[in-house]
Amino acid sequence: MDIFLAGPAAQLLARNPPHLLAGNRSLCCSFPQRRGGRAALLAVLLCLCGLMLAPASQALHQPLWELGIGVGALSTPPYRGSDSRVNYIVPFPYFIYRGSFLRVDREGGIRGKLFSGDDISFDLSLAANVPVRNEDDGARRGMDDLDPLIELGTELSIDLWRSQDRDQRFGLDIPLRAVYSVGNPLLEYQGLTLSPFLNYRIWQEDEGALMRYSVSAGPIFATSRYHDYFYEVDSRFVTPERPEYHADSGYSGSRVTISVTRHFSKYLIGAFARYDDLNGAVFEDSPLVETSDYFVVGLVFGWILGESSTMVQH
């Protein structure tokens, strides 16, 4: 669930839970659920796999830093398990830094490298969720709004396979983070999350543009305190349709994410789609869970205003 220091939003959206951007609710989208949703996801995956069959390039070099501005759009449920949707359009500053220790990029958000070897790395990482505002007719009607969350922790990345030119990678990434709400009190501990995922990436050059394709999938686990933050029904908020509920620790569902980014000399475009499945989650029987699967989609466009003359190997 990586969030960027200053906004490469396509990968921010693609790797994180669906509460990542705040802004004007100005889009209008609807998406198929259950069998229809899974069939649509399969079709998108097949299209992306077709793109991935194109030949990959040699080792790539990119500027040490890039600076610009962009705009992102996101359509998502307000929280995992809600059957309503919120739609955001958000401007953001765009900053990428590809240093040997500190990296801010589309691959993994903000990362401070604690250790890096040929096939394994251990990084510091940061994530965030925007607040959840309750609607008049939703499952959380009459309940308190939820403060935004920040997540601080580490991520272990293991390369299971890389191509000879290092422009394709299949690996296992294991983020473990402590979660804190930001509000009143200023910071309050809200549990732990663990979300290991398998990831396949391709980088290639195409007519002067750098293309990046990614497919990832994996489960999510969290403590009862984290689950209660979203799915608990305290005795104060019990109604005939909404019984008291307290969540357990354990399995939080699974997700499949695909993303494509095209990086030109002065601008970039990107898109992602994620399918989230809550079947079997320990909080699935919460009265606040209205659907057990859904889609999240996002788009991003960025303008690069300046970049370093120093090039580093990608």
Task: Name each region found by the language model.
Residues 59-65, 80-81, 100-121, 161-170, ...:
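Short loop/turn motifs that connect adjacent beta-strands in outer-membrane beta-barrel proteins
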Residues 80-85, 135-140, 183-190, 225-234, ...:
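Outer-membrane beta-barrel translocator domains and adjoining extracellular loop/strand segments
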Residues 65, 85-91, 118, 146-152, ...:
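Residues that define the transmembrane beta-barrel architecture of outer-membrane proteins
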Residues 186-268, 276-279:
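Outer-membrane beta-barrel transmembrane domain signature
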Residues 74-80, 129-135, 159-163, 177-185, ...:
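Sequence/structural signature of outer-membrane beta-barrel proteins
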Residues 71-75, 91-97, 108-114, 152-158, ...:
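Residues on the lipid-exposed face of transmembrane beta-strands in outer-membrane beta-barrel proteins
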Residues 256-314:
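Predominantly the C-terminal beta-signal and adjacent terminal strand-loop region
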Residues 49, 54-56:
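N-terminal signal peptide c-region/cleavage motif recognized by signal peptidases
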